[in-house]
Amino acid sequence: DKDMGETEVRRRALELLRQANAEREAELVERLINLQAMGANAVVGLDDVLQAVSDKRVEALIISDGFRYHGYIDEASGFVVSNLARSPLAENELAEVEDVVDTAVAATVAQGGHVEIIADNLALEDAGRIGAILRY
């Protein structure tokens, strides 16, 4: 439309970008869920994701916006866990961290993976609010 002002053009462009991003995010979550369901290179849920982070296997860490969780880390090895019952290490060998999700983000980036923060996706919420597509 030739009569659109600059403000209207920007508003429409921004809306198109938001829509494209929402579609990309939905496709990414769908891919994650499908890979995990097939037993392929993906995991969902905090415990399995933290194990994959600890094993340095995460290619893409996918997190629901605002997801935080208390947990523990072995600073020497980088082992991260939210549930002490799943830890091969004793509690006194681990340092308490306020947010293991943030720790997982930092570890994933340091290991060359990338992180996607996803807003308002019910499939990801139902899968435990966190998942990872794995390198192997």
Where in this protein do the model-derived segments appear?
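Terminal alpha-helical anchor/extension segments at protein ends
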Residues: 1-136
